């Protein structure tokens, strides 16, 4: 879809949704096709005027709904900065996620970079309390896992007791990178080579663009990146951190130390993903195998993978160790 077509669809859908009252919008979302439910929220697919729309419902806690905190990008729960990392984090708040979608949508509409899904509309909608996701369901265990602090407990219990959602209406891109790339790699030959070249180029372009503008994604695995087969779209900003947020001193220091995190993370993820997909190594074997390749070992016997696929492009061009600075 061209930039002009995306902007045109944005105008139509954004206007249509803005005209809906809360009750009608709630009914529209409730009638959508369920896609999933996870730690980041419930997702559905629906159509607005014939245009497919992806809807994400992010829990909005009572603390975030207080007048003094509405739209605040501050760390209102006082979470430790290391909650930016990893699987199962309670995340820092819905308003931060919204702010990033506003940023990225404006970048797309201004023609600065196309690699983000547009946000057509957002609304705070009431709804019944929902069970916590599996990763946080054991509140005491989750609190302990994230350092045991009182802020972590307030955050998780706030999510548990939430009776409203920040509902995001986003451009629908039907494929995530994980699923799409598996098909391309299975095809082998030129299809694999073209796909890997596009992915490598787009990962670098997208992370460089975000990071140069003070935005760190922090969760850019391949199920959080979408594709139309021609470019990548970075999505799911539940852990994103911007230098333009209202940051405390600890977060400013954390941000400064992690400016290269996205680039290292995406390179690491691509390499490990390819080795696992092509050769099927377990995690410990995979790390040893990647290091051996980067150090120039195994080239003769590993020209093709176990299914006859070529070894990941450019692996031996990075044997000087630059890649390994990002690969655990």
Where are these regions (language model features)?
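Catalytic-loop of the protein kinase fold
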Residues: 212-222, 227
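Activation segment of protein kinase catalytic domains, centered on the conserved DFG
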Residues: 185-199
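Conserved hydrophobic alpha-helix
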Residues: 206-210
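C-lobe/activation-segment region of protein kinase-like
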Residues: 233-327
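Regulatory N- and C-terminal appendages and interdomain linkers associated
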Residues: 1-53, 60-68, 278, 296-328
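Conserved ATP-binding subdomain of kinase catalytic cores across diverse folds
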Residues: 28-167
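Activation segment
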Residues: 60, 125, 175, 228-243
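Conserved short submotifs of the Hanks-type protein kinase catalytic core
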Residues: 165-176
């Amino acid at each position: 879809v061209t930039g002009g077509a995306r902007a045109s669809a944005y105008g139509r859908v954004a206007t249509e949704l803005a005209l809906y009252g809360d009750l009608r919008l709630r009914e529209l979302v409730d009638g959508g096709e369920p896609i999933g439910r996870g730690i980041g929220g419930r997702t559905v697919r629906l159509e607005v005027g014939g245009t497919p729309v992806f809807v994400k419902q992010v829990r909005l806690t009572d603390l975030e709904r207080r007048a003094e905190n509405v739209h605040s990008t501050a760390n209102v729960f006082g979470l430790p900065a290391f909650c930016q990392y990893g699987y199962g984090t309670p995340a820092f708040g819905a308003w931060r996620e919204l702010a990033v979608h506003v940023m990225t949508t404006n970048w797309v509409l201004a023609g600065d970079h196309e690699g983000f899904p547009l946000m057509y509309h957002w609304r705070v909608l009431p709804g019944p309390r929902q069970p916590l996701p599996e990763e946080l369901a054991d509140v005491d265990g989750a609190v302990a896992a994230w350092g045991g602090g009182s802020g972590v407990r307030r955050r998780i219990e706030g999510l548990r007791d939430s009776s409203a959602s920040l509902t995001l209406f986003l451009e629908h891109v039907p494929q995530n990178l994980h699923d799409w790339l598996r098909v391309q790699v299975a095809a082998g030959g030129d299809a694999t080579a073209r796909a890997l070249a596009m992915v490598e180029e787009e990962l670098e372009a997208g992370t460089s663009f975000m990071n140069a503008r003070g935005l760190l994604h922090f969760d850019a695995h391949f199920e959080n990146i979408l594709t139309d087969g021609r470019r990548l779209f970075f999505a799911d900003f539940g852990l994103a951190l911007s230098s333009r947020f209202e940051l405390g001193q600890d977060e400013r220091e954390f941000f400064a130390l992690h400016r290269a995190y996205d680039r290292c993370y995406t390179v690491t993820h691509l390499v490990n993903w390819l080795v696992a997909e092509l050769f099927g190594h377990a995690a410990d074997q995979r790390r040893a195998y990647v290091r051996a390749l980067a150090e120039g070992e195994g080239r003769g016997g590993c020209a093709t993978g176990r299914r006859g696929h070529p070894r990941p492009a450019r692996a031996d061009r990075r044997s000087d160790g630059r890649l390994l600075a990002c690969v655990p």
